[in-house]
From Swiss-Prot:
The keyword Signal does not apply. Its EC number is 4.1.99.17. [4Fe-4S] cluster binds at residues 406, 409, 413. GO terms for biological process: thiamine biosynthetic process; thiamine diphosphate biosynthetic process. It comes from Methanoculleus marisnigri (strain ATCC 35101 / DSM 1498 / JR1). This is Phosphomethylpyrimidine synthase. Keywords: 4Fe-4S, Iron, Iron-sulfur, Lyase, Metal-binding, S-adenosyl-L-methionine, Thiamine biosynthesis, Zinc. Pathway: Cofactor biosynthesis; thiamine diphosphate biosynthesis. It holds the Pfam family ThiC_Rad_SAM.
Length: 424
């Protein structure tokens, strides 16, 4: 019996109770959200997972993606990225390796954390085809489905699956063209395979079989956005919207079959199109959880893309996005270091909180900080801060002569001056 089927029968499971307690909502609110497909709770029958609810009415969650590349294969470094992501407060991880021993890397990552771990089975299937048969276009569909099941058994409990790339989607892309090209690795692999083999995407044509595998292993299906824009000038184009419509229809089918679903969204969107994208996604998918990569709101700030994405993520969250994939300062430049993973998670967590201040009216912590600053209560300020360690380190490094204030104002602290005359 899947979580959705339990929820439909009126059963409040332990996972639902945990989410309700963590989010400050009723157990029945969570149960109804799961039953209707507005909330997902990734679980795994193969390992202990820290329970995390994603969706409508819940705090915006942050994912940290890690993984090797063909140029950098260091499993110990990837495990350290897991630690840094957890230290920074990530809610979930995705393991997206494209180099090295896939089984060993994923096993080490899964063993290093209790967070939900996502994957993209398509990567492994295509790259193994290239290693064994000389090119990604020689991937065998049976291998793709086998790898999906194997990754689930290892403890991967949500998966990005590129079902929305089919002949109709490709036609839209070919007819329209793009300024920034096709930047999704999964989208590129599948498009190349389809064109070379003159066959439909097996994840689309054999979707019923895919659902059987995912349901058997209680995997949450995250519909991949293989046609997402890689430049702001391509945002909200026909190929992106076509893929969304296909994924929306398939999500209905998956939900009917008892498979939890998330819809992934675009990665580069100008500020004035973010609300349009969130509203469109929520409308056509029947309010399923929306997972945004960033989004990045400008293309000209490499080295600072964690900040660029935080702007987009804050707005996306405020309009109703439920799940944010972090972006690191190394985006578009290099594989991130553990330190950059930490920075990326922190930037996205700040953005998620800013969005929740609007979407959920969650402002109690900000009120507490305002009072602590008014009272020059530094310990309270550190306790409320999203990163107490960093805040304390900066202050300790530049401690003022008068320890009530700080070195920004020194003797002329506005709060101390006014405090002599007002009792706020």
């Amino acid at each position: 019996m899947s979580l959705i089927e339990d929820a439909r029968r009126g059963v409040v499971t332990e996972e639902m109770r945990i989410v309700a307690a963590a989010e400050g909502v009723t157990e029945d609110f969570v149960r109804r959200g799961v039953a209707e497909g507005h909330i997902v709770i990734p679980v795994s029958p193969y390992r202990r997972v820290k329970i995390c609810g994603i969706g409508e009415g819940l705090r915006t969650k942050v994912n940290a993606s890690i993984g090797t590349s063909t140029d950098m294969v260091d499993v110990d470094m990837e495990v350290e990225k897991v630690r840094q992501a957890e230290r920074a407060g990530a809610d979930t991880l995705m393991e997206l390796s494209t180099g090295g021993d896939f089984l060993e890397i994923r096993r080490r990552v899964v063993e290093a954390t209790t967070l939900s771990v996502g994957s993209v089975p398509l990567y492994q299937a295509f790259i193994e085809a290239a290693r064994k048969r000389g090119a990604v276009v020689h991937m065998e569909p049976d291998d793709l489905f086998r790898i999906t099941a194997e990754q689930a058994k290892l403890g991967t409990n949500f998966m990005a699956i590129h079902t929305g790339i089919n002949y109709e989607t490709m036609k839209r892309l070919q007819n329209q063209g793009r300024h920034g090209g096709l930047v999704s690795r999964g989208g590129a692999f599948m498009t190349a395979w389809m064109l070379h083999n003159e066959k439909e995407n097996p994840l689309y044509s054999e979707f019923d079989y895919l659902l059987e595998i995912l349901k058997e292993h209680e995997v949450t299906l995250s519909f991949g956005n293989g046609m997402r824009a890689g430049a702001v000038h391509d945002a909200t184009d026909r190929a992106q919207v076509q893929e969304l419509l296909i994924n929306a229809e398939l999500a209905d089918k998956a939900h009917e079959q008892g498979v939890q679903t998330i819809i992934e969204g675009p990665g580069h969107i100008p500020v004035d199109e973010i609300q349009t994208n969130v509203v469109l996604q929520k409308r056509v998918t029947n309010r399923r959880p929306f997972y945004m990569l960033g989004p990045l709101v400008t293309d000209i700030a490499p080295g600072y893309d964690d900040r660029v994405a935080a702007i987009g993520a804050a707005l996306s969250s405020s309009y109703g996005a439920d799940f944010i994939c972090y972006v690191t300062p190394a985006e578009h430049l290099a594989l991130p270091t553990p330190e950059e993973v930490y920075e990326g998670v922190m930037s996205s967590r700040i953005a998620a909180h800013v969005g929740d201040m609007i979407k959920l009216k969650k402002r109690d912590a900000d009120l507490e900080m305002g009072h602590a600053r008014r009272d020059l209560d530094w310990e309270r300020q550190f306790a409320v801060a999203m990163n107490p360690e960093r805040a304390r380190a900066i202050r300790d490094e530049r401690m003022p002569a008068d320890t009530d204030g700080c070195t920004m104002c020194g003797d002329y602290c506005a709060l101390k001056i006014v405090g002599r005359h007002f009792n706020f």
